[in-house]
Amino acid sequence: TLEPSSAASDVYKRQHMRDATLDEVFIVLSIGASLISTLGLLANSSAVVIGGMVVAPWIMPLRAAAFAILLGEVRLLGRSLRTLLVGVLSTTLLSFLLGSVTGLPQFGTEVLARTSPNLLDLGIALVAGGLATYAKLRSDAVSSLAGTAIAVALVPPVCVMGLLLSHQSW
């Protein structure tokens, strides 16, 4: 494992511990992102889906998990994964409930496009991850860029998972 050797490492460690914490801000933003993204998927509106991605807070515990793995910080990794699990499960549940309540007979292209990932989707995820890392390392980069980048890859597909479960489409 890597050993933190400076005050900067301690600052990063404290920051990542905060980022990994399951708190009210994470829950409210996750629920908001889930509702906006799911409603956008149901309305077949890419603009609304993007709106949901902008508020998703999942980059914070993901970044903390990566930091924990690099330093061998098991406690931080556990906290990060628990926070992410709550985000994924709450998003899946909310999407499932919205899909069940609306009772749409079929889904539009926004949902269907996320049921058959391809290499282009992988490329988008890799570029988004690279931009998220760049934004974290450069304090002058737009801070919302990191959250949006990771949300591109995660929030809408998790919403689609809940919607497909509501239609019993495995």
Label the predicted regions.
Residues 15-25, 112-118, 144-149:
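Short, amphipathic, aromatic/basic-enriched membrane-interface segments that mark the entry/exit
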Residues 95-110:
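Transmembrane alpha-helix boundary signature
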Residues 1-8, 12:
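Single conserved hydrophobic/aromatic residue that forms the stacking wall/gate
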Residues 69-71, 109, 158-170:
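Transmembrane helix-loop junctions at the membrane interface of multipass transporters and ion channels
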Residues 78-89, 144-153:
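Cytoplasmic-side transmembrane-helix entry/capping segments in multi-pass membrane proteins
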Residues 34-39, 65, 96, 130-134, ...:
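Alpha-helical transmembrane segments of multipass membrane proteins
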Residues 46-59, 113-125:
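Structural signature of hydrophobic alpha-helical transmembrane segments
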Residues 62-78, 82, 130-142:
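C-terminal ends of transmembrane helices
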